[in-house]
């Protein structure tokens, strides 16, 4: 199994090397949207050693933080938060920024503006824009306080500004023909954060009704001879969707969203990316058992991905817990890949977005399913270790020397 893991990772690295060398990667554009957040990366103070701002012991775990909050019931508490840095954020910018850093020509449309009415980019997004081929602000960003712990993170979101991102605003800013042209040249269309952006479902509907039926099958095409592709994994246009933690949305909302995406899949193959909790929720709404008893986590998640895929009707379902990732494809392919989990990440906010970027990046390049999983895990694994998005050289090197999961 470990030898297979290494062989898959090396094969993925070889494929990416070829894609860079023959120009395929540079001729595989992406379009992504539509949110935008400013993420404050925060540690929660447990005990101060002095009043120097960085001289403290942080609360290490989410249960430890929960206990501190619970102890204040019926009383009061003052919990100190130390902002380590402000970063450009939002599921969309993190996803698109990861694609751009890997060398994919990327257009981003989203809530990254100086204010709601301005077409100017907010300065904090300038490093993000430098990774992209084009960035079009649609509104001002929302704000997230990201409380980082050793065992996860708690995201406290203030989402009012991103509600301005709607189908009407999108067409107003880029024009219907401009949107069609951007989609027509894109092999990958990535749409994330349905949960917090009330206008995203309307954008899906607008794309289904006014854009996707007008597109050719392929999207941007690289010149030169093409290597044979596995059945069902050919290089064609794909849509990647990440709902982004729909726990706060009702079952009726989620059922409606899945039905819209089913209609989208009739026009362009849809891949739905889910973390473990999201997969359980989606399975429940669809009326299927997510993860039945199986000899291993990998088998359980692979089987669960296929059950969700079969019931949803989507081209591909990918599930990415911390331990690795599993996927099922319409062509009958199914796979599990053990990830390079680290117990002490330098940064965890954005890990899921980086997995989605890596997986969808590999998918539109035509890699086999298990290699797509390896690339997704490697992009995320490098990101949480380095606290920055990997470029293609870092990704290839990481795949060639992929760490074992830490216990």
Model-derived regions: residue spans:
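Intrinsic disorder/low-complexity segments
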Residues: 95, 222-227, 345, 377
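Short pre-catalytic strand/loop immediately N-terminal to key active-site residues, enriched for Gly-Thr
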Residues: 83-86, 339-350
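Short alpha-helical functional segments enriched in proximate histidine and acidic residues
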Residues: 383
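Ribokinase/PfkB-type carbohydrate-kinase core domain
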Residues: 1-73, 82-91, 100-334, 367, ...
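Short glycine/serine/threonine-rich phosphate/pyrophosphate-binding segments
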Residues: 91-95, 356
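Short, small-residue alpha-helix embedded
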Residues: 99, 281-284, 345-369, 373, ...
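Metal-cofactor-binding active-site regions of metalloenzymes
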Residues: 76
């Amino acid at each position: 199994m470990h030898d297979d893991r290494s062989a898959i990772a090396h094969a993925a690295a070889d494929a990416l090397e070829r894609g860079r060398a023959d120009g395929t990667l540079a001729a595989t554009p992406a379009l992504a949207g539509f949110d935008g957040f400013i993420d404050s990366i925060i540690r929660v103070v447990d005990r101060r050693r002095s009043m120097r701002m960085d001289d403290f012991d942080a609360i290490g775990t989410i249960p430890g933080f929960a206990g501190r909050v619970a102890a204040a019931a019926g009383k009061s508490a003052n919990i100190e938060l130390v902002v380590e840095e402000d970063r450009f954020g939002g599921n969309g910018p993190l996803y698109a920024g990861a694609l751009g850093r890997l060398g994919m020509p990327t257009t981003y449309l989203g809530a990254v503006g100086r204010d709601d009415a301005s077409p100017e980019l907010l300065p904090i997004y300038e490093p993000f824009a430098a990774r992209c081929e084009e960035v079009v602000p649609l509104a001002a960003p929302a704000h997230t306080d990201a409380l980082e712990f050793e065992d996860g993170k708690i995201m406290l979101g203030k989402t009012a500004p991103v509600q301005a991102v709607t189908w009407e605003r999108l067409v107003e800013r880029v024009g219907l023909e401009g949107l069609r042209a951007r989609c027509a040249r894109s092999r990958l269309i990535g749409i994330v954060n349905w949960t917090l952006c009330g206008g995203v479902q309307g954008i899906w509907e607008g794309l289904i009704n006014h854009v996707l039926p007008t597109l050719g099958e392929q999207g941007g095409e690289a010149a030169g001879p093409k290597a044979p592709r596995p059945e069902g994994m050919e290089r064609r246009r794909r849509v990647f969707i990440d709902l982004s933690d729909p726990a706060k949305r009702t079952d009726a909302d989620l059922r409606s969203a899945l039905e819209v995406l089913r209609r989208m899949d009739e026009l362009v193959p849809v891949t739905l990316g889910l973390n473990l909790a999201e997969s359980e929720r989606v399975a429940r709404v669809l009326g299927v058992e997510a993860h039945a008893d199986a000899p291993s986590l990998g088998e359980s998640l692979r089987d669960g991905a296929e059950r969700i895929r079969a019931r949803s009707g989507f081209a591909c379902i990918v599930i990415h817990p911390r331990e690795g990732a599993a996927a099922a494809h319409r062509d009958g392919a199914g796979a599990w890949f053990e990830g390079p989990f680290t117990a002490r990440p330098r940064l965890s906010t954005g890990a899921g977005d980086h997995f989605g970027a890596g997986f969808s990046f590999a998918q539109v390049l035509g890699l086999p399913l298990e290699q797509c999983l390896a690339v997704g895990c490697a992009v995320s694994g490098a990101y949480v270790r380095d606290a920055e998005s990997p470029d293609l050289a870092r990704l290839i090197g990481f795949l060639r020397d992929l760490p074992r999961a830490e216990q």
